Amino acid sequence: MASQMHTSISSGDEGKDAVLKKERPYKIFFKDLFVFKENEIAARKKERMKNHSMKIYQKTTFSSRMKSRSHLGQLAFFADAGSSSYERLGLDPTLILRLTEGADRKRTVHEFINDQRDRFLLEYTVSTKKKTIKRFERLIAIKENQLKKAEKKLQDDALSFEEFLRENDQRSVDALKMAAQETINKLQMTSELKKASMEVQSIKSDIAKTEFLLKEYMKYGFFLLKLSPKQWQIQQSQKRAQSSKSNHILPKILEKFSINTAKGDNSIDSDKMSVSEEWSSRRGSQGGRHGKHTLGQDSRKSSGFTRPESMASEDSLEYFLEDELVEFDLLPEIYFKEPEELLQVFTELEEQNLTLVQYSQDVDENLEDVNKREKFIQDKINNNISFLLEHKHMLRMNCEREEEKAAELELRSRLFSFGEFNSDAQEKLIDSLSKKINQVYRVCIGDAEVGSLNAVQKLVKVESRLVELSDLIESIPREHVEAIERLKQKERRQKLREEKMKEKQRHQEERLKAALERAVAQPKKKLGRRLIYRSKPQSADKQELLLVSDTRSKSQDEEYFFS
């Protein structure tokens, strides 16, 4: 295979050299000397590059390649036939000579048969290769024809595409011209539309201005109609109704006008009555300090309310402004011919407004007085409520205190009645209590009715007197109360000190007396062993109930009331 590749490469190089020789006008003879060496170097380089590009399992060693080409050494018998046979077989004669230089000429029949077999195989392979080459040449020719046809078709397509491009360019140019013309037309149309819209806006603004002026003038006309007398208004409306019978709006206007005039008269009368009554009552309550002012105001008010009928019919044409602006053809007739008449009406209206302003000011003053009085009454009520709440809280605390006292007294009574009942001791205690109650009653209330009341009634009166005194103490300034309390505390402390001194002196006297008795008494002899505390019998001495006058421990209330 390598030899075949070498021969094909050499044949290709020879063909290239022949072409170059034909094309070149000069002939170089010394180059042919190095052709074989150059071809061999190129073949080795190509084979080396091929080995580099081959995969690992496709590569072979030099010995294996030489073994695969060992049959070439058996072709030495073709040397006598000349170099034409080697060329016909596609072999390189130089390679054959180099391989057959040291070959053995002696061969057997089997070797000859093998050589013939190999020759046949080689010829067969050569013939198959030639057939494949011819087939490939035919395919190449077919492909060349197809390529020529395709090239021709491409040329035709290119020509048609160029024609299409020319037509497309022409159409685009025409379209651009048409678009430019359309844009010009559009700009012209937009400019015309802008002009038309500006004209419309100006017309609308003029219409709005004229409508505004019309409304203002109609308001002025309605105002003048309001100031005109009612009879003249009715006459004008009847004239317009007769002149324009086709107009269906004027009868409704007349009907509404008559209703509004009737309502206006009634409202004016009622307003007069209510205002006069309120004015008289308010002025009567204020007294005679505003008498002159009242007369002046009444006179002005009477003059104001007896204005012409045109003044009293302010609401007679309210339907003109309440409804939308009615479109009707009316001749602009005015009742007032001279400006002085209108000025006179304005002066009357101004006087009426002044009276109303004065009346509103008086009403505001009265309202302010009423608000002040209401605020004062509300504050007084709030103070009374707070005082009553405090009094309620105080009464509740007093009730709780009295309940505690009652419970304490009940407990004391139980303790008092506990044990052996001694009527004499209780009678003595009750007598002492009644004496103390009489003393307290004389101190708190006086000597009157001392013998006619029992102890409970006296205690009730004393308690009521104490409540009154406590209320009076709350009304006394705090400084005086604190000064009195300090004096009382000082007296109480002085009394306690005196009692302590007396108690101490009495205790010393008792000690001295006991010491004298012990000194005088004979010594007692102790017989037997001393008893244990738990075995000591109770003393048979009974505790006597002490009287109130002999008690040294007093309650807090007794110290407060009797100190």
Swiss-Prot record:
Query: Is the keyword Coiled coil assigned to this protein?
Result: yes
Tissue spec. comment: Expressed exclusively in testis where it is detected mainly in spermatogonia and spermatocytes (at protein level).
Which portions of the chain have biased composition (kind: Basic and acidic residues)? Answer: 269-281
Give the observed phenotype of the deletion mutant.
Mutant males are infertile. They exhibit normal mounting behaviors and produce coital plugs but fail to produce any offspring after mating with wild-type adult females. Significantly reduced sperm count and motility with spermatozoa displaying morphological abnormalities including short or absent flagella, abnormal nuclei, disordered filaments, abnormally long manchettes and abnormal sperm heads. Impaired fibrous sheaths and disorganized axonemes in sperm flagella. Sperm heads display acrosomal dysplasia. Significantly reduced levels of Cfap53, Ift88, Ift20 and Odf2 in the testis.
**Cross-referenced InterPro entries, in alphabetical order?**
CFAP_domain-containing, DUF4200
Q: Which residues form a coiled coil?
A: 128-211, 361-415, 454-522
Q: Where in the cell is it found?
A: Cytoplasm, Cytoskeleton, Microtubule organizing center, Centrosome; Cytoplasm, Perinuclear region; Cell projection, Cilium, Flagellum; Cytoplasm, Cytoskeleton
For this UniProt entry, the molecular function terms from Gene Ontology, in alphabetical order, are:
ubiquitin-modified histone reader activity
Q: Which Pfam families match?
A: DUF4200 (PF13863)
| Any single GO BP term | intraciliary anterograde transport
- Show the stretches that span the lipid bilayer: none
GO terms for cellular component: centrosome; manchette; perinuclear region of cytoplasm; sperm flagellum; sperm head
Record region (Disordered): 265-310, 543-563
* Key words, A-Z: Cell projection, Cilium, Coiled coil, Cytoplasm, Cytoskeleton, Differentiation, Flagellum, Spermatogenesis
Q: How the protein assembles, per its UniProt entry?
A: Interacts with CCDC42, CFAP53, IFT88 and ODF2. Interacts with CCDC146. Interacts with TEKT3. Interacts with ubiquitinated histone H2A.
Q: What's this chain's function?
A: Essential for male fertility. Required for sperm flagellum biogenesis. Also required for acrosome biogenesis. Required for the attachment of developing acrosomes to the nucleus during spermiogenesis and may be involved in the transport of fibrous sheath components.
What is this protein's record name?
A: Coiled-coil domain-containing protein 38
